[in-house]
Amino acid sequence: LLRLYALYKQGSEGDVSGEKPGFFDFVGTAKHEAWGKLKGMAGDEAMQKYVDLVKKLRS
């Protein structure tokens, strides 16, 4: 599900921004890192991959 979050953020906001969450914020750190792995991906591409993944998960 982190992949869905990252694709959504990349599609709606673009490349990751802000500081990485603190060491003990495990959820925040995981989200930040997942989003960061998509750096440079176009918003339209991220949105399409999001839709494709949702369709795959629903089937």
Model-based region annotation:
Residues 1-23, 29-59:
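A charge-rich, low-complexity, intrinsically flexible signal that marks solvent-exposed coils, linkers
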